[in-house]
Amino acid sequence: MKVFLTGASSGIGEALARHYAAQGATLGLFARREAELARIASALAPASIATYPGDVRDAAALARAGADFIARFGVPDVVVANAGISRGVLTGEAIDLPVFKDVFDTNVQGMVQTFQPFVAAMVEARRGTLVGVASVAGFRGLPGSGAYSASKAAATTYLESLRVELAGSGVAVVTICPGFIATPMTARNPYWMPFLLAPDKAARLVARAIDRRRRFYVLPWQMAWVGRLLKLLPRPLYDFAFRRAGRKPRQSA
């Protein structure tokens, strides 16, 4: 199996890299932190690994990485757009406008730019799976997390569009919506996180969903039910229930 993975230097991305390496997969790992990529590659030796330091907001860097991976290893079986950021924001604060842009550029545009270098080759080969990591946070708008919630809702809708667009091509599209995972990103959350999953457990569940080519998968199962209930809440009741919800700190403050 050949797997290309972004956001591979920590959290779910690192756990997925470890999972697939243990299965004997050939890996292409893309992330911003070069030292962390080197650490992971060393830890996973002697697995076949190519590392690509870069930012998913940089389309040219992803295009180069994709071309190199295909040239060295062939068309990937799985491409996982996992890179993402979460920042607390307030619309009334001008200083947060660049934060909104960074979140969307990473979580939405970065996903598109991750897939683009591989789509034509995968369609030509009539095989492969494109995997986008969205979030339960995209089911409803969370106060103070307007950028993150909106970006994950956009990612979910984009993935649905892509799935239908590629129907019949042999290329599957899998949408992954995690709840709370114990990662450096969630470690900053100053509020209760129900059904918190360890990254290794999350990676096993995600990999199983990918293997089964699940169109849409929420983990853990408890959050799937929470998500369904959230979607059913009438707007007045949702507003009342969440107006005092804990908020992610604003890093621009």
Give residue ranges: language-model regions.
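Active-site helix of classical SDR
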Residues: 115, 151
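C-terminal helical subdomain
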Residues: 175, 191-226
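Rossmann-fold cofactor-recognition segment
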Residues: 44-60
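Conserved glycine-rich Rossmann-like NAD(P)H-binding loop of the short-chain dehydrogenase/reductase
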Residues: 23-40
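Conserved mid-core segment of classical short-chain dehydrogenase/reductases
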Residues: 86-101, 144
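Conserved glycine-rich cofactor-binding loop
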Residues: 9-10
